[in-house]
Amino acid sequence: MPPRSLTLSRLPVAALGLPFSSCSPPPPRLRFPFAARRARSLATRASSSSPDSSFGSRMEDSVKRTLADNPVVIYSKSWCSYSMEVKALFKRIGVQPHVIELDQLGAQGPQLQKVLERLTGQSTVPNVFIGGKHIGGCTDTVKLHRKGELATMLSELDIDVNNS
């Protein structure tokens, strides 16, 4: 009997070694060293140029306004299972968060995600804020809910919660 070979389509997903802790696609890999140096050079110039940095600060101001105007904010991607889980949790407890779907913002989505990473240190979605305070992602939000701390945080903002 010939030895069995695994094709990629039959290979278990876990065997691919893909990280499932985030909903961010991996960064592209550059094949040639000179391309990597050029990309770093362009990134450095872009981050130091005034139009980009003023655009970034405008986006940062926009994020801060959104957080100030809404007691519960979720930065999400519509296709992300972790984002779906967090949105379903808030729905179960009867809370309507202000949801911003980064994947539906066109070119501004990835830029906004970079601004969020600068502000929070978290590069993945969902990015959950309560009362303007960053509480983390899906795992953090679910843990707070299980410990009863999520309901406490929401009640401090005069938000009624169904105990589900």
Curated annotation (Swiss-Prot):
Location(s), subcellular: Cytoplasm
Primary location group: cytoplasm
Binding site for [2Fe-2S] cluster: 80
A GO-annotated cellular component: cytoplasm
Domain Glutaredoxin: 60-161
Cross-referenced InterPro entries: Glutaredoxin (IPR002109), Glutaredoxin_euk/vir (IPR011899), Glutaredoxin_subgr (IPR014025), Thioredoxin-like_sf (IPR036249)
Key words, A-Z: 2Fe-2S, Cytoplasm, Iron, Iron-sulfur, Metal-binding, Redox-active center
GO molecular function: 2 iron, 2 sulfur cluster binding; glutathione disulfide oxidoreductase activity; metal ion binding
GO BP, one annotated term: cellular response to oxidative stress
PANTHER family in the record: GLUTAREDOXIN 2, GLUTAREDOXIN-1-RELATED
The name this protein goes by in its record: Monothiol glutaredoxin-S10
Name of the gene encoding the protein in the UniProt record: GRXS10
